[in-house]
Amino acid sequence: MDLANPGALKALMAQYGLRPQHRLGQNFLIDGRVLDGIVSAAGLEPTDVVLEIGPGLGTLTQRLAAKAGRVVCVELDRGLVQVLHDTVQKAYDNVEVIHGDAGRIDLHKLLGERLAPGQKAKVVANLPYYITTPLVMRLLEEELPLSHVVVMVQKEVADRMVSPPGSKAYGALSVAVQYYTEPRIVLRVSRASFMPQPEVDSAVVSLRYRERPPVDAPPEAFFRVVRAAFGQRRKSLVNALTSLGVEKAAVHAALEAAGIDPGRRGESLSLEEFAAVARTLWQRT
């Protein structure tokens, strides 16, 4: 059964007495071209271990299972877990379905038990929109054994991930994503590619992990500066960074030493400039 077929999907849901749960962001992808594009972007090999978050009814899972060595699905909705057990897990011996909350489950343990020594997994998923940003940040910050993330996200979130300094969409998420990975938008996806249709369009993003950060600064100091700068976007840097508990005069001196105009705002700074501020500020405190 091709689960990307709308008729088959409706019949399957009726068979199990299920309806899409809006509170869980359940919009099922039914566009075969987009599904194939996601799998292609992940560049799957027969030895790959894939973590799929929010597999829904298994439309993407089918295609992942045909390409990867192992697919581990984490699904929050108990009703969908039963469907996944009866369909994709029984049809593919390389699929494992886990009932759990991807925002809380111990991903280090989950992946560590399924990877060979030195191996890294890939995350490939159509993410529920209500958890996109915190989940992506978790995948970035927790030093998980991951090499590549390919996910469907809300169009506006995708734009934020790849936005350059000075653009309207540039923010703390942009900096974090570009610090840890090399991001690119793979596909723009119409809301008509889903059932039921969401209220927004989407995009598929590829986040390939860097071997090392692109800038030289202590990570904790770097991200403290970033959070402070974007936490009060309308304020100048010299005023926003005082929220770090540093005297305004010391902030002013650190900015000037880094070659940064104290009157600039956080959204105008590049990663290298944030790193320069972090280095000079922490040398003076």
Curated annotation (Swiss-Prot):
One of its GO terms (molecular function) is RNA binding. SUPFAM superfamilies: S-adenosyl-L-methionine-dependent methyltransferases. It comes from the Bacteria. Pfam families: RrnaAD (PF00398). The keyword RNA-binding applies. It is an enzyme of class 2 (transferase). It catalyses: adenosine(1518)/adenosine(1519) in 16S rRNA + 4 S-adenosyl-L-methionine = N(6)-dimethyladenosine(1518)/N(6)-dimethyladenosine(1519) in 16S rRNA + 4 S-adenosyl-L-homocysteine + 4 H(+). S-adenosyl-L-methionine binds at residues 27, 29, 54, 75, 101, 126. It is found in: Cytoplasm. Its EC number is 2.1.1.182. Keywords: Cytoplasm, Methyltransferase, RNA-binding, rRNA processing, S-adenosyl-L-methionine, Transferase. Its main location: cytoplasm. GO terms for cellular component: cytosol. Belongs to the class I-like SAM-binding methyltransferase superfamily. rRNA adenine N(6)-methyltransferase family. RsmA subfamily. NCBIfam families: ksgA (TIGR00755). Specifically dimethylates two adjacent adenosines (A1518 and A1519) in the loop of a conserved hairpin near the 3'-end of 16S rRNA in the 30S particle. May play a critical role in biogenesis of 30S subunits. This is Ribosomal RNA small subunit methyltransferase A. It comes from Symbiobacterium thermophilum (strain DSM 24528 / JCM 14929 / IAM 14863 / T). The gene is rsmA.
